[in-house]
Amino acid sequence: MSNKNEALLRRKARVRRALKATANGRPRLSVFRSSKQIYVQVIDDAVGRTLAAASSLDKDLKASLKTGADKAAAEAVGKLVAERAKAAGVTKVVFDRSGYIFHGRVKALADAAREGGLDF
């Protein structure tokens, strides 16, 4: 494994450990970012169940997006996951950036989810 991937895994584990300490039973808004798409899930760790999910591959979004890997796509995914989470009865979450730096696409997704009504 490369040093870059090992560093990402270490950061991811550190972020998850901190989240578990402060979650207080709230679901986790987990982000995965690839080079071509962005994915997000609202996960209830107590039950081990996904409550809501969205990605730039969703049929609702894919036609309207130029690419799945830019800030505009991240904003659209953030708004969509906020709608779906509220429909599932979730408003308070903890943000799991999965070891990614809170900048660019990850920040755009978080800001859009906040605008959509999620509280974190």
Curated annotation (Swiss-Prot):
NCBIfam families given in the database record: L18_bact
One Pfam family here: Ribosomal_L18p
Signal peptide start and end residues: none
Recorded superkingdom: Bacteria
Organism in which the protein naturally occurs: Methylorubrum populi (strain ATCC BAA-705 / NCIMB 13946 / BJ001)
Calcium among keywords: no
A Gene Ontology molecular function term of the record: structural constituent of ribosome
Family annotation (CDD domains): Ribosomal_L18_L5e
InterPro entries: Ribosomal_uL18_bac-type, Ribosomal_uL18_bac/euk
Keywords, sorted A to Z: Ribonucleoprotein, Ribosomal protein, RNA-binding, rRNA-binding
UniProt name for this protein: Large ribosomal subunit protein uL18
GO biological process entries: translation
Lineage: Bacteria, Pseudomonadati, Pseudomonadota, Alphaproteobacteria, Hyphomicrobiales
Gene3D superfamilies cross-referenced by the UniProt entry: 3.30.420.100
Record note on quaternary structure: Part of the 50S ribosomal subunit; part of the 5S rRNA/L5/L18/L25 subcomplex. Contacts the 5S and 23S rRNAs.
Gene Ontology CC terms: cytosolic large ribosomal subunit
Role summary: This is one of the proteins that bind and probably mediate the attachment of the 5S RNA into the large ribosomal subunit, where it forms part of the central protuberance.
Gene transcribed to yield this protein: rplR
Family under the similarity heading: Belongs to the universal ribosomal protein uL18 family.
